[in-house]
C-alpha cells in the first residue's frame, strides 16, 4: 500500500517537477481501454506509472526500440499446487512468460492441512516479484461425505480475510448445497460480500437454468465452460467467463468461438491446473493469448482478455493497463502475433531481460517451515479386491485432455467372484485409499483409457480430498506403488509388473508439493512419463494429472472417491454393477 509521500512523489513526476525512476521510450503502447496502439514515454515512480507523454529525463531510461508495450499478464484462476512446486518457485516459471499476477485458490493444500496450508502459501509468496492474490477455498471438502484432511467452515475462513492478498471466495463447487440453501456455504458467500470480495463459480455441467441459483447468491465468474454454448450461457447470465487452457482441461479451442467484438470485455484467461513441464514448454497465459490469436481473435483483444478484463473480473483497479496510476507491470513484445516476450517489468523493476530472469529480483528467504500431516492408512491386498456378481459394470471412461469422464457400461472379466483387469480391453482397476485419518476406507472401480500393459501408477495428488489414487493391472503392483509413496511422505510412483519402482517424484509438502527447484521437478516429471511409456501403450495426454482428476466428484460424469463410485448426475455413490 502506498503512503502519502510516495503519492506526492508520483504527482511531482507526472507534472514534470521531478525525475522519474525510469522512463521507457520508443515503445508502441497497447492501450487496453481504447484498443489502440499509441506512442509516448512511460514514466515510472515508486513502482507505479506516473504518466504517459513526453518525459525527457529520468534516473534510468530504457529504449524499447519499437517493441510493443503490454500490461503484465494475469492468470485469473490457477491452483499453484498443480505445478507441484512452492509459490516462490512457481513465480520463477511464470515471469519469463509475462505473467506478473495470479489469482489462486489454494484448496488443494487446504484439503490436506486446512488454514495452515493457506497460510503457508501466503507466506511462501512473500518477497517474490509476482502478485499472488488468494481466493479462499469455499468447498473443503468438495462434497459431503468425502474424507479429506480438514474441513473449513465459514468461521474458520473469515479471519483470513484480514490478509491483504485475500480478495474473495474461490470456486463454489458444491452446487447442490447452493441450490438447497445450505447455511454454511451461504454464510461463506455473505462473509465474502461483506469483505468486498468477488465470488468465483465452478459451474461444471450446469444448464442455463441451473445458473440462476449461482447468480441469485452473487456468484459472478466461471471457468468450467467446455463448449461455446456453455460460455455463451454464462455470458448471458451476467458472468465473467474465464477461458481455460491447462494440462488436462484444454477447453480454449472449443470455447473461443463465443468471443465477439461486442462481448470480449467479459472474457479472460486462466490455466486452472497446469504442470510445470507444460508451463516450461508451452507457457502460461501467454500461450492462451497465442492460441486465441491463431484461432481468429484480434491480438489486441486477446491481450485485453489477459490483462484489463482479468483485473476487472477480480476488482483489481490498479492492475491490467499501461496508464497513469497503474502498477508498472509491463511486458515488452517483439511480435504481437506470436507473443514473443523480450523483457518483463514488475513494479517498475526489470525481472526478465531477453528471456533471462534477474535472480537478484527474488529476495533470498529461508524455506517456509511446514509440518505435513502424516500419511495414515493400513491398506492390504484384501482391501484392493473388487467383489462382483455381475459382468455388466459401470466403467469410468477417461477422456484424454479433459476433466470430464464418460459413464460407460462394459462387460468385464470375473474370476473367483472378483474383478480381473484385462489388457486387451483396457479395463483396469482403480483404487482410492483414504490417507488422512486411517479410516480404512477404500473406494474401488473400473477405468478405461490408461492403456497399461503391466504394473501400476499411484499418487497422493487426488483432487480435491487428496487421498491416494492408484490404477493398475494387478493388486500387487498397485499396493507396491501405494506403499512406496506412503514411505516417501507423498508423491507419484510408476511400478512395473514385478512391483519395482521405475521412477518417482517425492512430494513431501502435504503430499502435493516438492521442496525442490522447478527444474528438478521438471526432470522428475520427464522421468515419470518415460517410465509410464514402459508400461503403457497410451499417449497424447498426461497420465498423472489425468488420474488425479478422476477422483473429483464435482465434474461429470463418473468419478471415484474413497467412498466408492460417484455419479455426478445423481450426486450419489452407486454400485459398480449395473442393476
Curated annotation (Swiss-Prot):
Needed co-factor(s): Mn(2+)
Top-rank taxon, per record: Bacteria
A Pfam family that the UniProt record links to this protein: Adenine_deam_C
Reaction(s) the record says it catalyses: adenine + H2O + H(+) = hypoxanthine + NH4(+)
EC number(s) recorded for this UniProt protein: 3.5.4.2
Gene Ontology terms: biological process: adenine catabolic process
Keyword Glycoprotein: no
Keywords (A to Z) from UniProt: Hydrolase, Manganese
GO molecular function terms attached to this record: adenine deaminase activity
Record flagged with keyword NAD: no
Protein family: Belongs to the metallo-dependent hydrolases superfamily. Adenine deaminase family.
PANTHER family, per database record: ADENINE DEAMINASE (PTHR11113:SF2), N-ACETYLGLUCOSAMINE-6-PHOSPHATE DEACETYLASE (PTHR11113)
Name used for this protein in its record: Adenine deaminase
UniProt organism field: Listeria monocytogenes serotype 4b (strain F2365)
